[in-house]
């Protein structure tokens, strides 16, 4: 660490100058890797462990981090602090070794809180839309020349990274409610996009507990801070009287402080007007499809307007917005002649949405932008508990596509639950009589089973949060064409 870097550390986080070496367990996750990247750029010695390399670990290695693709006690040797992902169990050998060596073990959000402590923090929370809204706020602040630091849960495509260290006073961060760790954060501004029943194991299956946790998060704001909340969401509307902080509401609702109206989608772009109190109407072109993204943009505009950012900078940022990785991510349009002998093409879109509300929003955006397309979805349910808890909602939403192919549930470490598997879900959907789902038992069969259902005027949505993103990229690489054994062997 050189003198200039050390001086910068002392100016930003005075007490953390005592920390030199920070070790991350589960460093390959987007949220963990983003914080590690910011700290690496601040001059800290970074090490970390994960089970397999990925683009996040490669980026960190490029910055000089030491990455171990195993979990061993010796990996934490000489660390000043160990940061742990919520996905890591307490009996992990590195965690055990850290405790034995009296090395502090903290959660990701605690380290994020330290980064935020001496900056103007803007935290984006909510069940859906956090990642995209974080990217929108970051893009606006960057366009305005404010050079923010950002830490996002997904790839910010314009920057090519999940996180970036800026020289300005702002830190814009996605706040994760999945393990309630966002309660460690003490931002100046907090956005809450919506609140639905998800990650209920964290909240003992009690939705009231989840709602109160969001209130507690907002009460971490100073009395002069501001909560920016989507009034279209019925739970948020219910909670507003309990928020003891200054609030700005946004939404399509007539009583919203920042109101979206005249929404129209043309292809991948949304066009709408934003009405703000004591401001001229703002006519927005947003380079992201769907009414849900208009709401995300309204949240970002509400924050930027409160900060006094120029309207022209806001509009430029939204019109040129490049989106985030795996959020309605266009991977290409491919001719079908080599795939199944038909004329025409198929568009391929990759999307991370894995909750029924998110899947519904993606389908609606696809229908609005490309109403004449044959809509084909390849869906991978994520977690048996989520499939069980939201079973009927999934069955209702998934009947809206023209053709549905379904992979087995991605377990994310969970044990199977009878009746919450993909075969059962396909059977239920089939029984409703609208579509006949196709179960794909082996991911290696996706291209082979997809090809016959394509018509030549298709939009393929590859949907889910497990390893299905890799399948989407693989489909793009082979241009949807099923591979012969010889071609697979060559690959």
UniProtKB/Swiss-Prot annotation:
UniProt source species: Escherichia coli O139:H28 (strain E24377A / ETEC)
Family annotation (InterPro entries): Mur-like_cat_sf, Mur_ligase_C, Mur_ligase_C_dom_sf, Mur_ligase_cen, Mur_ligase_N, MurCDEF_pg_biosynth, UDP-N-AcMur_Ala_ligase_MurC
Pathway(s) annotated for this protein in UniProt: Cell wall biogenesis; peptidoglycan biosynthesis
Sorted UniProt keywords: ATP-binding, Cell cycle, Cell division, Cell shape, Cell wall biogenesis/degradation, Cytoplasm, Ligase, Nucleotide-binding, Peptidoglycan synthesis
A Pfam short name: Mur_ligase
Record GO biological process: cell division; cell wall organization; peptidoglycan biosynthetic process; regulation of cell shape
Function recorded in the entry: Cell wall formation.
SUPFAM superfamilies in the record: MurCD N-terminal domain, MurD-like peptide ligases, catalytic domain, MurD-like peptide ligases, peptide-binding domain
A GO molecular-function annotation: UDP-N-acetylmuramate-L-alanine ligase activity
Name of the protein this chain belongs to: UDP-N-acetylmuramate--L-alanine ligase
GO CC annotation: cytoplasm
């Amino acid at each position: 660490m050189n003198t200039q870097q050390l001086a910068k550390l002392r100016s930003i986080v005075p007490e953390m100058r005592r920390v030199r070496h920070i070790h991350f367990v589960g460093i390959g996750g987007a949220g963990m890797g983003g914080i590690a990247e910011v700290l690496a750029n601040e001059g800290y010695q970074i090490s970390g462990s994960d089970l397999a390399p990925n683009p996040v670990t490669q980026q960190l290695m490029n910055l000089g981090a030491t990455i171990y693709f195993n979990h061993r006690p010796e990996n934490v040797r000489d660390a000043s602090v160990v940061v742990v992902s919520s996905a890591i169990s307490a009996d992990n050998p590195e965690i055990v070794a850290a405790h034995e060596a009296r090395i502090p073990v903290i959660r990701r959000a605690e380290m994020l809180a330290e980064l935020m402590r001496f900056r103007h923090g803007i935290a984006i929370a909510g069940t859906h839309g956090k990642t995209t809204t974080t990217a929108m706020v970051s893009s606006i602040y960057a366009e305005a020349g404010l050079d923010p630091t950002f830490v996002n849960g997904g790839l910010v495509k314009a920057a090519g990274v999940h996180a970036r260290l800026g020289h300005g006073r702002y830190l814009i961060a996605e706040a994760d409610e999945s393990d309630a760790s966002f309660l460690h954060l003490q931002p100046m501004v907090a956005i809450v996009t919506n609140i639905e029943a998800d990650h209920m194991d964290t909240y003992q299956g009690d939705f009231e507990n989840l709602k109160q946790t969001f209130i507690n998060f907002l009460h971490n704001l100073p009395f002069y801070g501001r909560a920016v909340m989507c009034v279209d969401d019925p739970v948020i509307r219910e909670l507003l009287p309990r928020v003891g902080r200054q609030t700005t509401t946004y939404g399509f609702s007539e009583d919203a402080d920042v109101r979206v109206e005249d929404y129209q989608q043309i292809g991948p772009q949304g066009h709408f007007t934003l009405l703000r109190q004591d401001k001229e109407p703002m006519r927005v072109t947003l380079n992201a499809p769907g009414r849900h993204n208009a709401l995300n943009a309204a949240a970002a505009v509400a924050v930027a307007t409160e900060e006094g950012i120029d309207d022209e900078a806001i509009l430029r940022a939204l019109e040129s917005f490049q989106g985030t990785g795996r959020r309605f991510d266009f991977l290409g349009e491919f001719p079908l002649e080599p795939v199944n002998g038909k004329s025409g093409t198929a568009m391929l879109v990759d999307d991370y949405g894995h909750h029924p509300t998110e899947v519904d929003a993606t389908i609606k955006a696809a229908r609005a932008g490309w109403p004449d397309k044959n809509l084909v979805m390849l869906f991978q349910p994520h977690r048996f508990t989520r499939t069980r808890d939201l079973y009927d909602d999934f069955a209702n939403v998934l009947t809206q596509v023209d053709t549905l192919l379904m992979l087995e549930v991605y377990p994310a470490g969970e044990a199977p639950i009878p009746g919450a598997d993909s075969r059962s879900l396909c059977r239920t959907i089939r029984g409703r009589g609208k579509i006949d789902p196709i179960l794909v038992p082996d991911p290696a069969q996706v291209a082979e089973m997809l090809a016959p259902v394509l018509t030549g005027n298709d939009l393929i949505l590859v949907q889910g949060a497990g390893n299905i993103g890799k399948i989407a990229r693989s489909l793009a690489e082979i241009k949807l064409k099923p591979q012969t054994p010889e071609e697979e062997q060559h690959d």
